[in-house]
Amino acid sequence: MKVILSRKGCDSDFGGMPGIIMPDDRIVYIPIPGDDFETIAYHEVNAGNGLGNLCDVISQVSLHMKMYGKKLEINPETKCHLDPDLDAGMYPRKSGWRGCFGQADAAQTVLKKAGVAEGDLFLFFGWFNRTCYKDGKLRFCKGQGIHMIFGWLQIEKVIYTHEMPV
């Protein structure tokens, strides 16, 4: 079995903000913004832990994100790229839903050449920052950023993008 560390979520170029560690230590993973091909908006994604939707939680700490290094306004229709998709409670699901994440093109080729296969384990890590309340508003605490593992997925089946039905 191989164990693969995979960085996911927002960074300084895509998203422009870390995932959120709430003052009570609840973790909020923030997927990167999506492009015009995405169908899921941040307001449709449950932030988990009784916090409401991702759009509302993100808007508490910032009104903007980044996409391709450019400022992106956060509003209920802002699309997100939900990858990895690990939590059945984040979005309405069809019966039989399974956790998944996607790699395409060069990234998929790297995994194939490395012999990544059924049974291997992905550990997902990302950039997170502690928050605190300042003047009654949720804000990121300066100097409290960390990289941490936030999820995992064991490969049940590999599906190559060129083999997917259209």
Report residues per predicted region.
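Structured alpha/beta reader/binder surfaces that contact nucleic acids or chromatin modification marks
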Residues: 2-4, 11-13, 19-166
